[in-house]
Amino acid sequence: MSQGVVRFDINKKSFSHTVSLGCDVISDISSDGKETVYIATDGNGVHFLSHKAQQVTRRFCHDVSDKEGIRSNSIYSLLVDDRGAVWVGHFQAGLDYSLYQNGLFQTYAYPPLFNSANLSIRSFVNRGHEKVIGSRDGLYYINEATGVVKSFVKPVLTSDLILTICFYEGEYYIGTYGGGMMVLNPETLSLKYFAQGGDGDAELFQ
């Protein structure tokens, strides 16, 4: 059963509940490493929680009268980048972003080659001009500096549902639902299976 956000005190080795966010289905959580915890819910938008005060300091919720707000309260993924921009991945509503947390959102697009509207966004990595976006319908690579946009779907991918993406040592590690993990090389735009061990004959993680 959904429990909302649960806090674990390392020193006391005990669990406790945080304040109510109006929705106990938590889809993503991260922090700035200092004071603020960023929380995405599947039903009540985005919340910024003060770790010290245990209070919500800011929230983004869908409002039909606000054309510059987030377009859905069903949030699948959330990122606050090092420039203070808030990136919000929705269920079947694309990817929103807000410059410098000013509360004004717009759908991410790189016209005319890519538009995230109507995509169900599950994961993404933003590295300035280079972005990798995971959805329920495959993987998208966008390089705004070179003008390169490429999509990957089955059978090139082991699964079209991309749950998580991580950049490490020049490559993107792609976690799929039911298809194990793959590795994307941004230089060659090639995908390979992530294999256990150091030899190419090792079994793929499942």
Predicted regions: what they are:
Residues 1-206:
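Carboxylate-rich, polar loop motifs that coordinate divalent cations or form catalytic acidic clusters
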